[in-house]
Regions:
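Small-residue-rich transmembrane alpha-helices
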Residues: 293, 326-357, 369-394, 425-435, ...
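C-terminal transmembrane helical bundles of large multi-pass transporters
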Residues: 498, 675-681, 688-840, 844-854
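Alpha-helical transmembrane segments, especially those used as permease/efflux helices
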Residues: 2, 17-21, 25, 269-272, ...
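Interfacial "coupling" helices/loops that link adjacent transmembrane helices in transporter permeases
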Residues: 4, 11-18, 278, 285-329, ...
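Juxtamembrane segments of multi-pass membrane proteins
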Residues: 451, 456-457, 463-621, 631, ...
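Alpha-helical transmembrane segments
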Residues: 6, 18-19, 30-62, 67-68, ...
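Membrane transport/envelope proteins' first extracytoplasmic loop
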Residues: 1-283, 295-298, 315, 530-532, ...
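Short cytosolic juxtamembrane segments of multi-pass membrane proteins
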Residues: 2, 394-410, 843-854
């Protein structure tokens, strides 16, 4: 065996306890990366299997070729088909069965009166397809719907809503439909549903009556099968009979597109998000690993020098250290790979806990999922150890024999170079970030500048560490006497080491702070938007199509207007059209009435003049498109193109979006009527509580949408932000844990390094309790440096991101002092906890052995 390999192996075994923190850091980082990749592989395979099983009997799908991109609607919005096409296709030779399919939004009310779903995943409704081979759903209990008001619901929705055979409830389409559950179905062979979505199946007549606004003779698609033709032959057979604007595709192609629409976008965002957090965890681990090897290498200066004196070359010393890192990285990566399966299960449970149930199935692992984490963990370990290894290899033998633990503060030319490079990055990145956030704004320039500031902060860490720790620890001598003074001095004595240890925590805290500030700013923007633009007293809301629900019935606003407590009630609907090749969301309302409950700011032109072909546009959107009053705007709807004229410009940035048309204009193009909210203004003399009670009683007859005050409406609009922050905090906890392991590991190594010094302190009268307190306070100071630096950096980056993302210039910036104070306190407390084990080890040192230590 090579001498370098033998020496490296013996060194690892001899110092294995010192490297436990490093191993743990790599294990956690690699486990997160592996868990993310395993979960992604598994979900993709589960979605593929789920859809393939459900659609196995479908040979071809006929649908409209006209499709519009729609925000939050996977696959976009397609035009409906004439149901007469179904009979025509049934008559084609070789077609064994042809069944119409109607799809729309429909949200069930559970047994407890609360809506089922509606928190993101779609709530779907459609007709029950009688041909079992063409129906992706399979009856698990009961029977198919045969009479008006009878429905089949997917098993997951029934379980969530406490529904069973014979249950009577309401289906919001969005008009309320009284229904009775006669069947419970699985998606495919045994899935509770199509992922986390819900599905309610009605008779074809009911589905056409409630889900298609243009009459009962329309369907969404026609599904075909053949007992004699292949899928490709079936498509070729029916294609010549299809009218213009209608297409046919094989069942396999339709399944692949459905899988991509439902799972592709979601999984792409899902796995990318998780990989970002895995990257943050590995970045934090990099600082911990580098610091550990820097300390261990410095502590072994005499050992390495002796090897050099005995004839070892620089390359052999370098190879020994890197070999240790390679072995350590490979071992820890292997353990992390195994732990990744547990992380995948934990991530799945985390999302299930917030109501986002993922499809079940066997675990799937691709080769890349094994190789990439192993390589990543090993490369991170070796790369982090490279600089300490090079430093060890460059040490002259005779000089090294006269030194011990050489890893001092950044001094001399190296310190000046570090200071210069760090200053260049910070003072170059700061203006770029500010300009990108305030001029334009430019997200690319902002992110580039922010990364430069982050890199510069890391580089300047050793330069700033001593001053920062002395400043933060200034009260300690007065509060804790000599113990506090020694803790402060110990934390500042090696700025390079302190900075490297604190930087890991700083990165984690900075990201936590960034998301906290950004989330608070989004909530403040929503609150200001409602306060500024919502002039009503109450809002009646339900999740809309594309946001997980079916919206509010358009019949509700007229019903509320008839209440004696109500002065005005105006429904605000949503539509979609293609403008300049891109799908745009349209607000649909009675423009003149809308002005009574929504403040649109200064209006140029006239809302009363919109009519059947008029358009009102926000000023920001009009400026971006080069439009003015009188401009003609070509639009494309699912039923074809239409030209609109800009007849009004308004402020925008509030409850109303960028495009507003009248209900008269939307009538020919509508797909499924729904309002996202009804804004209500009360009559003078009616109290808020009286008005809310009256409005809620009336709304209960329309599927129980929720009546809210302005403050409640603003708070509910921001509810998704709190959910997002909860997930982010849970994911970032791993990075912060790795950073705290780094602090504990560094202090443990420092205790070993300062054994003789600690023994002398005990010999001159320091008690065990004082020694423990000294080490704990040193840990707190390092954590304070990392936490305060992370808070400052994260707050700045949060401000920059908030401004850069606010292209309309109507957003608000908020600095949540309470939450940031909690982050600070948690950081300090975590620092104290990280110091417990090193402090206990220091206190257990035998005085005589410690004093005699070399």
């Amino acid at each position: 065996m090579n001498a370098s390999v033998r020496i490296g192996a013996r060194s690892l075994l001899a110092h294995r306890r010192r490297l436990l923190g490093t191993v743990a850091s790599i294990v956690l980082g690699v486990a997160f990366l592996t868990g993310t990749m395993v979960l992604g592989d598994t979900l993709r395979a589960n979605f593929d299997t789920l859809f393939a099983d459900a659609n196995a009997g479908t040979g071809a799908v006929v649908r409209s070729a006209e499709v519009l991109d729609a925000p939050n609607v996977p696959g976009g919005v397609r035009a409906p088909l004439d149901d007469a096409l179904t009979a025509k296709l049934r008559a084609v030779p070789g077609v064994s069965a042809a069944e119409p399919s109607v799809q729309g939004a429909g949200q069930l009310i559970g047994a407890d009166g609360t809506p089922i779903g509606g928190q993101g995943p779609p709530t779907l409704a459609g007709n029950w397809i009688n041909d079992s081979q063409l129906n992706p759903y399979r009856l698990a209990e009961g029977r198919a719907p045969a009479a008006p008001g009878e429905v089949v619901v997917n098993r997951g929705a029934a379980r969530t809503g406490g529904l069973h055979l014979g249950s009577t409830t309401v289906l919001r389409t969005p008009d309320p439909v009284r229904v009775t559950v006669v069947g419970i179905a699985t998606f495919g062979a045994d899935a509770d549903g199509m992922g986390p979505s819900t599905f309610t199946a009605l008779t074809l007549a009911d589905a056409q009556a409630h889900l298609t606004p243009r009459g009962s003779g329309q369907v969404s698609t026609v599904r075909l099968r053949s007992d004699t033709l292949s899928q490709r032959q079936l498509v070729e057979r029916v294609r010549p009979l299809l009218p213009d604007g209608v297409e046919a595709l094989t069942g396999a192609d339709a399944t692949a597109q459905s899988t991509a629409d439902v799972s592709g976008r979601f999984l792409g965002l899902f796995t990318t998000l998780l990989l970002v957090f895995a990257g943050i965890a590995l970045l934090v681990a990099t600082f911990t690993i580098h610091n550990t090897f820097a300390i261990v290498t410095a502590q072994r200066t005499r050992e390495n020098a002796l090897l050099r004196a005995l004839g070892a070359s620089r390359g052999q010393v370098l190879g020994t250290t890197l070999g240790e890192a390679l072995a350590l990285g490979a071992l820890a990566s292997g353990l992390g790979l195994l732990g990744g399966f547990g992380v995948a299960a934990g991530l799945k449970a985390l999302f299930a806990a917030i109501g986002f149930t993922l499809p079940t199935g066997g675990t799937v692992v691709h080769t890349a999922t094994i190789v990439l984490p192993l390589l990543t963990g090993t490369v991170v370990a070796v790369g982090s150890a490279l600089a300490p290894a090079l430093r060890a290899a460059r040490t002259a033998p005779l000089a090294a024999l006269r030194e011990t633990a050489v890893d001092g503060a950044a001094e001399g030319r190296g310190a000046w170079l570090r200071a210069g490079l760090g200053a260049l990055l910070v003072f170059g990145g700061l203006p770029a970030t500010v300009v990108g956030a305030t001029r334009g704004p430019s997200l690319t320039l902002t992110v580039g500048g922010a990364l430069a500031v982050l890199a510069g902060t890391v580089v300047l860490g050793p330069v700033a560490a001593a001053l920062a720790v002395r400043t933060l620890g200034a009260p300690l001598p007065r509060l804790r006497g000599v113990t506090g003074a020694l803790a402060r001095r110990n934390a500042a004595r090696n700025p390079k080491r302190t900075a490297a240890t604190a930087t890991a925590l700083m990165v984690g805290v900075a990201v936590v702070t960034l998301f906290t500030v950004f989330g608070a700013s989004v909530k403040a923007t929503l609150d200001d938007s409602v306060s500024r633009s919502f002039a009503g007293d109450l809002a009646v809301t339900a999740p809309a199509t594309g946001a997980g629900g079916s919206g509010v019935s358009p019949k509700l606003a007229p019903a509320l207007s008839a209440l004696p407590e109500v002065r005005a009630a105006v429904g605000l609907g949503r539509g979609v059209a293609q403008v300049d090749g891109h799908g745009r969301q349209l607000d649909v309302a009675d423009p003149a009435a809308l002005a009574q409950v929504v403040d649109l700011g200064r209006i140029d032109g006239s809302l009363d003049a919109l009519g059947a072909d008029g358009l009102a546009v926000s000023r920001a959107e009009a400026a971006a498109r080069g439009w003015s009053l009188g401009s003609t705007v070509p639009m494309r709807f699912t039923d074809g193109p239409a030209a609109f004229t800009v007849r009004a410009l308004y402020q925008g940035g509030g409850v109303a979006g960028d495009y507003l048309i009248s209900r008269q204009a939307w009538q020919p193009h509508r797909v499924q009527d729904a309002d996202t909210m009804v804004a209500v203004a009360l009559r003078p003399g009616v109290t808020l509580s009286q008005g809310k009670a009256a409005v809620q009683r009336a709304a209960d007859a329309y599927g129980s949408p929720k009546a809210q005050t302005r403050a409640e409406y603003a708070a509910s609009s921001a509810g998704a932000v709190d959910m997002m922050l909860s997930v982010v905090y849970a994911l970032l906890a791993l990075a912060v844990l790795i950073a705290l392991l780094g602090i504990a590991n560094t202090l443990t190594l420092a205790v070993h390094e300062r054994t003789r010094e600690l023994g002398l302190l005990r010999a001159v009268g320091q008690t065990r309790g004082q020694l423990r307190a000294m080490v704990r306070w040193e840990s707190v100071l390092v954590a304070a440096f990392g936490t305060t630096g992370g808070l400052a950096l994260g707050a700045f980056l949060g401000w920059a991101l908030t401004r850069a993302a606010d292209s309309a210039g109507t957003g608000s910036f908020a600095l949540p002092a309470g939450r940031l104070a909690v982050v600070l306190l948690v950081g300090l407390l975590a620092g104290a906890l990280a110091g417990l084990r090193p402090a206990a080890r220091a206190a257990r040192l035998d005085i005589l052995r410690a004093v005699a230590a070399d």
